[in-house]
Amino acid sequence: MIKDCKIKPPFFEIGPKSYLFGDDVLDLALAADAAAEKYDVDIIFTTPVIDIRRVKEATRRIHVFAPHMDALRPGRGLAEILPESLVAAGAEGVMLNHCEKQLSMSALRASILRADEVGLATIVCADSIAEAEAVAKLSPNIIVAEPTELIGTGKASDEDYVRASIDAVKNCNPDILVLQGAGIKCYNDVYRNIYAGAEATGSSSGIVALPTREARNAMVDEMIRAVRDAWDARQKG
């Protein structure tokens, strides 16, 4: 866990994965940047590695994260992702252990330590409450509590899971932020998660699988508005 992580609740994560590439990635990043400014919500934009510098230089308000890295040090390691190269490109953090890029616990520990060493914030995925508790002991900055079976389905976690996973992480380390992901596809999904107690939520296919740039950008605005609306309603009690 880096101590100067600038991300504060409420926040949202957007990951293009490999649905988008080239100018479409940049266009989505610009839409996210505008929504972050409009609603005063931090957004993690988990950027394809090759686009990190381009996205970072074109935006002001979003937090640019890499989708993966390896725990190696400068030297040999063909086609691996060097932590120092992510920092040099402008990344502020890195996502680890996504279900599409899973790590063993020993590899995850090594990767978090390397990220801490070079100053990258860490957002680590956990697909169950038990795994969230185990990951919390490694002290990442953020844990994504998303059941793998719900990813990309359009079905979000229920409120009991949201609350139980938050409690599991906070009981282990109250400084870790908790993002509730998987199956987020609309305003209501976002609102429900945030209002139920989540500090953040996020979406990939719910945004990037939409067929046009206009639809994707409109969905970004809708979801970030939901974050702000739910958070403000929660604060009012």
Task: Give the location of each predicted region.
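Conserved N-terminal beta1-alpha1 strand-loop-helix module at the mouth
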Residues: M1-I81, T122, A132-S139
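Conserved, mostly hydrophobic/aromatic
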Residues: K17, P48, L86, E146, ...
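Glycine/small-residue-rich loop that forms an oxyanion/phosphate-binding "nest" at active or ligand-binding sites
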Residues: R60-A115
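Glycine-rich beta-to-alpha transition loops that act as phosphate-gripper elements at the mouths
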Residues: P67-A71, G75-G77, S104-S106, V124-I129, ...
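Glycine/Thr-rich beta-alpha phosphate-binding loop at enzyme active sites
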Residues: L72-R73, A79, P140-S165, I176, ...
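Glycine-rich phosphate-binding active-site loops on the catalytic face of alpha/beta enzymes
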Residues: E92-L103, I142-K155, A196-M219
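C-terminal helical cap(s) of enzyme catalytic domains, especially alpha/beta-barrels
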Residues: S111-E117, S157-D160, S205-G237
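Catalytic cores of alpha/beta
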Residues: A126-S139, G183-T201
